[in-house]
Regions:
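A conserved segment at the C-terminal end of the G1
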Residues: 24-40
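Hydrophobic anchor at the beta1->P-loop junction of P-loop NTPases
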Residues: 18
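PAPS-dependent sulfotransferase catalytic domain
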Residues: 127-148
C-alpha cells in the first residue's frame, strides 16, 4: 500500500538556514541574520537534522521526511508567535535579550494565541531561522518543502 502525506495549508513558508561545522561562526552570523526585518530568533532543530539524516540512510522516504519537517517547521513558527519555547535566559546566545527587537517577544507573551495565530502569521509573514550542523549534504527533505 502506498500512502501520501498531504497537508494542504502550511504556516512556515519562509525559512533561512545557517549551516556549518561546529565552531565555525554560525551563532555570530545568526545574530546578524536575526536582526533583519521579519526574521525570528534563531533556533536549533535537531528533529529536522535527524529527519534529513534518516532519509539519507534510507530509513525514511523523502515524502515522509519532508512532511515531518514541514510539520515541525509549522510547529516552530506557531510556537514562536505565541512565545512558547522562547528563550528568556539572559546570558544564552539565543536569548530574547540578545535580540534587537526585545519588545516584540515580550508582547507575544500577552498577545492573542491559539486560533488567531495562523492569521497573525499570514499577516506578518515571519521568517523561521534555523541553525544546523553539517546538514547541507543531507538537506533534500528540508529543501523539498521550498521548491518554489
Amino acid at each position: 500500500m502506498n500512502f501520501e502525506v498531504v497537508r494542504p495549508k502550511t504556516l512556515c513558508n519562509r525559512l533561512v538556514v545557517v549551516d556549518g561545522l561546529p565552531g565555525c561562526g554560525k551563532t555570530m552570523l545568526s545574530a546578524v541574520i536575526s536582526s533583519l526585518e521579519r526574521v525570528e530568533l534563531f533556533k536549533y532543530s535537531y528533529e529536522i537534522e535527524v529527519q534529513c539524516i534518516l532519509h539519507h540512510f534510507k530509513k525514511a522516504d523523502i515524502d515522509t521526511s519532508a512532511s515531518l519537517i514541514q510539520y515541525h517547521l509549522d510547529l516552530i513558527i506557531y510556537n514562536q508567535m505565541m512565545a512558547r519555547e522562547t528563550n528568556f535566559r539572559y546570558s544564552d546566545l539565543s536569548s530574547v535579550f540578545k535580540s534587537v527587537d526585545k519588545l516584540k517577544y515580550f508582547k507575544r507573551l500577552f498577545g492573542p494565541g491559539d486560533e488567531k495565530v495562523p492569521d497573525i502569521i499570514e499577516k506578518q509573514k515571519p521568517i523561521v531561522h534555523l541553525v544546523t550542523h553539517c546538514l547541507s549534504a543531507y538537506s533534500n527533505p528540508l529543501l523539498d518543502n521550498f521548491k518554489n
